[in-house]
Each structure stands twice: as C-alpha cells, then as structure tokens.
Amino acid sequence: MAAESLPFSFGTLSSWELEAWYEDLQEVLSSDENGGTYVSPPGNEEEESKIFTTLDPASLAWLTEEEPEPAEVTSTSQSPHSPDSSQSSLAQEEEEEDQGRTRKRKQSGHSPARAGKQRMKEKEQENERKVAQLAEENERLKQEIERLTREVEATRRALIDRMVNLHQA
C-alpha cells in the first residue's frame, strides 16, 4: 500500500503557520467535551490503548463556521418520553451549549485558533523587525571594524617607520 503525498511541501510553510496548525491539532485532539476521547500525556498506557473516536458533525461546526443543519441536531436527540430521558436531556443541553459557543465565536469573529494564528503572525513580524535591526547593527559594527583596522594599520606603519629611523640615527 503506497502512502499518498502531501498537497504541499514542508519547505513552503512558515514557522508561524506550522505552529498554528500544531495548536489547532492539539485543540482538536484534546477536545474531551465535544465527544472525543481525551488524549492523555505519554506514560498512561491504559489511555493510550483507546482508539480516538471521531467527533460528530454538529460538534465540528465551529471548524467550518457553518451552523449545523437542524436534521443533524434533531436526529441525535430522543423524545422526552423515552426511558433514557435524563440522558437525552443532558445530551440536548450539551448540544445547545455547543451551538451557543459556535454562535458566540461567529459573532465575535475570533476563534482560539485564529487568535493563536494572529499571535504567531505578530510574533513573526516582531522577529522580522529584530532581524532587520540586528542586520543594521551588524553592518554598523563591520564599518567600525574596518575603520579600526585602518587605524591600526596606520599606527603600525608609523611605529615601524619610527623604529627604522631610530636604528638609522
């Protein structure tokens, strides 16, 4: 079985993009409240043996910034007259909370992933400014070194001439 190639090469991604993708991946993997299993830190062998479960489409709606379709939400809920009504009411409350969070994220226009990407972008820009400042300082220091080198050479020549003149006199 051959592995598929990636649609991009790693060389084309900047460090802040990779960091933002990593943060997004960590958020998805650790989302215990959305129906996925919690990814435990290394060393917990019991948790490592569990298989990561797939999240339902309603809980992933915030990723695509689309509202879940009513058919998806109502198909997962049970009628209040069923024997499991206490469990279904809890599930409905959790779904309503998830939908409320989705709406809040849409209204505010800022998701944790976007905030992380924005921080990374700002950090990248700050690093670029620092690089420019350091390059400027480096150039200034090179010019200073050249000036001091010329001064040392002139002093050395003057000292040699003086020594030669002392021996001749």
UniProtKB/Swiss-Prot annotation:
Does the record carry DNA-binding as a key word? yes
Which protein family is named in the record?
Belongs to the bZIP family.
The UniProt function text for this chain reads:
Multifunctional transcription factor in endoplasmic reticulum (ER) stress response. Plays an essential role in the response to a wide variety of cell stresses and induces cell cycle arrest and apoptosis in response to ER stress. Plays a dual role both as an inhibitor of CCAAT/enhancer-binding protein (C/EBP) function and as an activator of other genes. Acts as a dominant-negative regulator of C/EBP-induced transcription: dimerizes with members of the C/EBP family, impairs their association with C/EBP binding sites in the promoter regions, and inhibits the expression of C/EBP regulated genes.
Compartment annotation: Cytoplasm; Nucleus
Q: Where is the bZIP domain?
A: 99-162
Q: What does UniProt say on post-translational modification here?
A: Ubiquitinated, leading to its degradation by the proteasome. Phosphorylation at serine residues by MAPK14 enhances its transcriptional activation activity while phosphorylation at serine residues by CK2 inhibits its transcriptional activation activity.
Stretches of Low complexity bias are at: 74-89
Explain what induces or represses this protein's expression.
Up-regulated by oxidative stress, amino-acid deprivation, hypoxia and endoplasmic reticulum stress. During ER stress, induced by a EIF2AK3/ATF4 pathway and/or ERN1/ATF6 pathway. Expression is suppressed by TLR-TRIF signaling pathway during prolonged ER stress.
Q: Which organism is it from?
A: Homo sapiens (Human)
User: What's said on domains?
Assistant: The N-terminal region is necessary for its proteasomal degradation, transcriptional activity and interaction with EP300/P300.
Pathological association: Myxoid liposarcoma: A soft tissue tumor that tends to occur in the limbs (especially the thigh) of patients ranging in age from 35 to 55 years. It is defined by the presence of a hypocellular spindle cell proliferation set in a myxoid background, often with mucin pooling. Lipoblasts tend to be small and often monovacuolated and to cluster around vessels or at the periphery of the lesion.
Which lineage ranks, top first, belong to the organism behind this chain? Eukaryota, Metazoa, Chordata, Craniata, Vertebrata
Would you kindly state one Gene Ontology biological process term found in this protein's UniProt entry?
ATF6-mediated unfolded protein response
Its quaternary organisation is: Heterodimer. Interacts with TCF7L2/TCF4, EP300/P300, HDAC1, HDAC5 and HDAC6. Interacts with TRIB3 which blocks its association with EP300/P300. Interacts with FOXO3, CEBPB and ATF4.
Q: Which PROSITE patterns does its entry note?
A: BZIP
Record GO cellular component, one term: RNA polymerase II transcription regulator complex
Coiled-coil segments on the chain, per record: none
Q: Where is this region: Leucine-zipper?
A: 134-148
* Molecular functions (GO terms): cAMP response element binding protein binding; DNA binding; DNA-binding transcription activator activity, RNA polymerase II-specific; DNA-binding transcription factor activity; DNA-binding transcription factor activity, RNA polymerase II-specific; identical protein binding; leucine zipper domain binding; protein heterodimerization activity
Q: Which residues carry this modification: Phosphoserine?
A: 14-15, 30-31, 79, 82
- Name assigned to this protein: DNA damage-inducible transcript 3 protein
Write the record's keywords in alphabetical order, separated by commas: Activator, Apoptosis, Cell cycle, Chromosomal rearrangement, Cytoplasm, DNA-binding, Growth arrest, Nucleus, Phosphoprotein, Proto-oncogene, Repressor, Stress response, Transcription, Transcription regulation, Ubl conjugation, Unfolded protein response, Wnt signaling pathway
User: Its domain of life?
Assistant: Eukaryota
What is the primary gene name for this protein?
A: DDIT3
